[in-house]
């Protein structure tokens, strides 16, 4: 290796150009030289490889990094180069190291490949998958797969590294296509011997194996056609049209009996999953013979209606009853009557429909701030009783919540207090379940099943204890605040009490102004007490610089000449028709 060092005295230009870099997958080399330049005078040649720049190795540098490194050398440029004659020998190896991965090579059709396949065709696990009796031609083994012509060389080598039974499978489409027949154990069912009796009867019962075998039969037929015609056109996959026309013997249905012929020619209901209410095909054929087909269909329709109607009716009736109990808790109408009317479509003698009961009311609408009295009614149809408790707070955004009563059912939740399974009716509050007797106030220990509660500092308190110990007092009405609190003027207020004096609307968290100790919203304050700038017609807020001129108030930046917009603050100005003018335009402009 003939390496040499070059030291070029600054400043730039250095008289050469670079090419390559890590981002181009090429070494940094000299691409051109300027005649009479500094690099040419230092005997630098075109094609020399740059090994280092200013003592830093250039092997990992990108093209831009190398340029910036050279630009940073202002006083002198020191480089280590390698002659192009010595670097030319190792150049092709380094550049073309990754090219074999990108070269697309078609699989050649050679005679050694035929001999290799024919030598292994006697093995039992290397037989060609034949689609139920079709005879495959030995010529097809020498025809490559259409997709193998587009397979990279490294993919071909990886396929040869697989075990011999898998690599020696005769039809290449099974290993190259997306059918996964070589990796799927069920594909071995396709290679049935040709002497199998009556194979076509099982075609509708095995859709997966049939699709795999039809694909392989299609590709074998396509390979035979291209091999006989000498077609060299490469495709990106086997054609998938006219499968029935090319492989008509595969879809041949033997006429051994009228029953099997009728099963294959009629509709394909066997492909659908059967339920307990649908009759078998033999039963329907018998019904057609005896003339009772329409009678059975009407009975089946009634059975389907009986099975499909009660389940939604229970789900839809229980939210309806819950909604009725929320809107009119004082009504004495039994909720069970609504369920019975919804389940009136149950046919006589049907045992698959359960009698209406309080099994699924836990799917009703969530709690809306009132007590759901569904727990007080049992399956016997006892009338509901209205909730007894303190009056509802007047705050619309109150913090007081109510527990939701859930009757006993299939669900067995865990109590949030004792961490035990709840057997029977329970309460739902704050996303947790509670025993009714354990949902008590943290201070007075009274039950909160039928009264409101508030969560404060991780504990639950009834609304009376919360109002007594925690709720702040309103600065206007002197009542306890159970909802949103407004903190203003060092006091706490109800939202409905802290309002604008002029318009009476709640100020909430908006900006307000005080005038004579009374709060005003921003709009009313500037309309009543604010000063409007004559120039911009916007209010002059507190802290704004302003001046008075021509009988009006102006922002200091708004008092300008009406013609040239020059600021007139602290200067002599003139007025024509109440418009300020500077000295230049005072006598030259007429309005």
From Swiss-Prot:
N6-acetyllysine found at: 89, 346
Biased composition (Polar residues): 134-143, 183-195, 207-217, 349-380
PROSITE patterns: LIM_DOMAIN_1, LIM_DOMAIN_2, PDZ
Region (Disordered): 125-240, 255-334, 348-398
Compositional bias ranges of the Low complexity kind: 144-161, 310-329
One annotated Gene Ontology cellular component of this protein: adherens junction
SMART domains reported for this sequence: LIM, PDZ
Domain PDZ: start-end pairs: 2-85
Composition bias, Basic and acidic residues: 258-273, 293-304
Tissue: Detected in brain, in neurons, including in hippocampal neurons, and glial cells (at protein level). Detected in heart and skeletal muscle.
Molecular-function GO term, any one: actin binding
Post-translational modification Phosphoserine, affected residues: 2, 111, 134, 137, 228, 260, 313, 318, 355, 357
Gene3D superfamilies membership: 2.30.42.10, Cysteine Rich Protein
Protein name stated in the entry: PDZ and LIM domain protein 5
